Amino acid sequence: MGRLSISLASLMVVSMLGSTATAFDYKDALEKSLLFFEAQRSGELPPDRRVNWRGDSALTDGFEQGVNLVGGYYDAGDHVKFGFPMAFAVTMLSWGVIEFEKETVGDGDGDHLCWERAEDMTTSRTAYKIDANRRGSEVAGETAAALAAASRAFKPFDAKYSNLLLLHAKQLFTFADTFRGRYDETLKFARKFYPSSTGFHDELLWAATWLYEATNDQSYLSYVSQNAVAFGGTGWAVKEFYWDNKYAGLQVLLTKVLLQAGSAPYSSVLKQYQAKAEFFVCACLQKNKGHDVKMTPGGLLYFDDWNNMQYPQVCPVPG
């Protein structure tokens, strides 16, 4: 498939979905997806919550370790708060706000053995951390990306809060890059739930890309250019985008930088990112000549048997 702008790809996705399954109410599905996040909230809930059968829960998370970890989102039907995928969810929600503004903690083993209401939980609220000795660049990098993206989303509405998010995003990126290491080698229990199959290089590139989006600081663009080959940014041609593999997302974001600004000093490297972004978009649009993403008869992109909905939910944002 020839050169394809991101805006054209977006139009094609809308057209393809509309012609494939016009009977489905996508507006209702979108509203339900946001309601799901509201139902998954941990901590003190506001009085105007729409999920009225949910109440306050886990109000002392982190206190045993001397930190305040109250709040956030539960992972699934259990009550674990996995920072790695939770940060990715925040990044993607923030990206959605940016692009469509006008339209729009626990022990895994013990927790999975007991399924109950969060308000009634009695299982351990063990907290695990990363630091300079117990490294976890994936978690720190993804959280940096989440805060940078959220900073960008909040900037038009709350400049003070946006600046605070950006400050911590920069700090976390520096930490992730300085003390490099895989989080699932430090926190070995995490391998059973959220193993890092792609390592931490994609998270470092992803975080730097979002920091460039939030700041326009050329040093971050220099980072993704200098590390493009070594970190796989211009080497990985992927057909999936999810909490563990950020290559497609960062490739699309950097293509946007190229198309909108040119970025002359780095244009040759950005064009390599663009080529990989086009591979991903074309695979989703069934235009990749034998290297397409599978699709169900109803028009749903199908990546994997296990928890497949996580993939098509995020693909429309970079696409």
PLM regions: where:
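Bacterial N-terminal signal peptides that target proteins for export
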Residues: 1-8
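N-terminal signal peptide
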Residues: 11-27
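Glycan-recognition and catalytic cores of secretory/periplasmic carbohydrate-active enzymes
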Residues: 22-319
